[in-house]
């Protein structure tokens, strides 16, 4: 989970995986299952692995990056939806 602890907001965050096509589908399924189990919320609470993005501009930047990926033929297979019930800067991993 190279991006969960910092909500993807540091320069060493995992951005891409290069995976052989023979294992890509299985790896994708396993990663999606793992990310769907990430506890999101107040990072000061025990058991929470992912907190909010730093500010609303960071959320807008993330949404724009996801839209650019889609516009260029990419598929978002997990996450990327806002979580307003947690606060204005929470987004699914």
PLM ranges: what are they?
Residues 1-93:
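ALDH superfamily catalytic-core signature
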């Amino acid at each position: 989970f190279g991006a969960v602890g910092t909500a993807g907001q540091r320069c060493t965050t995992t951005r891409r995986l290069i995976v052989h096509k023979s294992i890509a589908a299985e790896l994708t399924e396993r990663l999606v299952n793992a990310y769907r189990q990430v506890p999101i919320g107040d990072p000061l609470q025990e058991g929470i692995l992912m907190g909010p993005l730093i500010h609303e501009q960071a959320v807008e930047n993330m949404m724009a990056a996801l839209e650019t990926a889609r516009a260029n033929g990419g598929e978002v297979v997990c996450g990327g939806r806002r979580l307003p019930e947690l606060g204005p800067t929470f987004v699914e991993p």
